[in-house]
Design a protein with these regions (language model features):
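Pyridoxal 5′-phosphate
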Residues: 1-387
């Protein structure tokens, strides 16, 4: 199988990640739940992971690095824990349902929600302008919630400029880094990010079931869940100290061990090298498919010759063929794994007018090869010729 669905999850990871997960499953106990060697080993590994990820993202305090099952849980913790009725939040048309649905729930509670539309004039590329976000700020605005990159088009958002706008107006800035963590440099301090939400199983090369959020000092998040913590057990309420405040229940120790190893392996390779390789594969793919009769490529790729930032995601359609049909042919006849449909990004499909057709998404990893990209392009050519 040629696996080109890395925006959903990476399958090929450094071998050391698999080894770390297995070793933790064999030898680590439950962190914070005893004084046995096994429990202490788990606690040490999780602490090491907090330290590593805090440094990786430019944070100041490892206690503010909270582990979750994925970015969806991290975003729910942030969105449901920060806002009260009567407050106002700004988000964008690019967002995944992991941002939109929690915000819609908050809207039902009386939180105002404004969605910044794409600013394209003429050809639709799916671009968000920071100035359009600033224009929607009101006296009751509390936060801006924004993705770092679209999971549908790969377009990268200028979060540094948005962070400056948020800080200028004394707003909280919450960033969904699901597609960029482990691919693009992220610095919480330099980008004025108050809450960074990330998943472990994509660019960070960790296992599924891992993720987290870094909670800045300005963000006072109410606990999303409560329960066992291993400390202060006579308290009726969840302890207020981070990370315990937001980490009720047993953590995914083996997964976190794998995530730690994934990040350490990324640092050995270097983010610049990872981005350059993925960018090269994406650009080669676009060059090969852009002249296919009936092909439509979605996103802002005009910057590619100048090496502008863009995640290695290419979403396409072939004339009026249903995206699910194209993806099914790619898998069953060519052994190429892609993702079809709406990709949990309904507002972007409304923007592009593809609500019914969906799109076929190709997403590349550092571990993909030029030969695989060539085979995928050739398969699209053959499918287009038969329509």
């Amino acid at each position: 199988m040629i696996y080109l669905d890395n925006a959903a999850t990476t399958i090929k990871k450094p071998d050391a990640v698999y080894d770390a997960v297995l070793d933790a499953m064999k030898h680590c106990g439950n962190s914070g739940r005893g004084a046995s060697d096994a429990s202490l080993d788990a606690s040490r590994k999780i602490y090491e992971a907090r330290m590593c990820l805090t440094e990786f993202f430019g944070g100041d305090d490892a206690a503010r690095l909270v582990f979750t099952a994925n970015a969806t849980e991290a975003l729910n913790i942030a969105i449901h824990g920060l806002f009260e009725p009567g407050e106002h939040v700004i988000t964008t048309q690019l967002e995944h349902n992991s941002v939109l649905r929690p915000l819609y729930m908050q809207r039902e509670r009386g939180v105002g929600v404004d969605i910044v539309p794409c600013s394209d004039v003429g050809i639709k590329r799916g671009i968000i302008s920071p100035s359009d976000i600033e224009a929607l700020i009101r006296p009751d605005t509390k936060a801006i919630v924004c993705t770092h990159a679209s999971n549908l088009t790969g377009n990268v958002v200028d979060i540094k400029s948005i962070g400056q706008i948020a800080r200028k107006h004394n707003l909280l800035f919450i960033v969904d880094a699901s597609q960029t963590a482990g691919v693009l440099p992220i610095n919480i301090r330099e980008m004025n990010i108050d809450v960074l939400c990330f998943t472990g199983h994509k660019g960070l090369m960790g296992p599924q079931g891992t993720g987290g959020l870094y909670v800045g000092e300005r963000a006072d998040i109410k606990p999303f869940k409560s329960g066992g913590t291993g400390v202060l057990s006579f308290l009726e309420n969840q302890p207020m100290e981070l990370p315990t405040r937001l980490e009720a229940g047993t953590l995914n120790g083996p997964g976190i061990a794998g995530l730690l190893t994934g990040v350490m392996e990324l640092e050995k390779i270097g983010l610049d090298n990872i981005y350059a390789k993925e960018h090269e594969l994406m650009q080669a793919f676009i060059e090969k498919i852009k002249t296919i009769p009936g092909i439509r490529i979605y996103g802002d790729f005009d910057m590619l010759p100048d090496k502008g930032l863009h995640c290695a995601i290419v979403s396409v359609n072939i004339a009026d063929m249903d995206s699910a049909e194209v993806s099914d042919i790619l898998m069953n006849e060519y052994g190429i794994a892609t993702r079809s449909g709406i990709h949990c990004a309904p507002l972007m499909h409304k923007f592009f007018g593809t609500q019914n057709q969906g799109m076929v998404r190709f997403s590349f990893s550092y571990y993909n090869t030029v030969d695989e990209i060539n085979e995928a392009a050739e398969a699209l050519m053959q499918i287009a010729a038969l329509r």
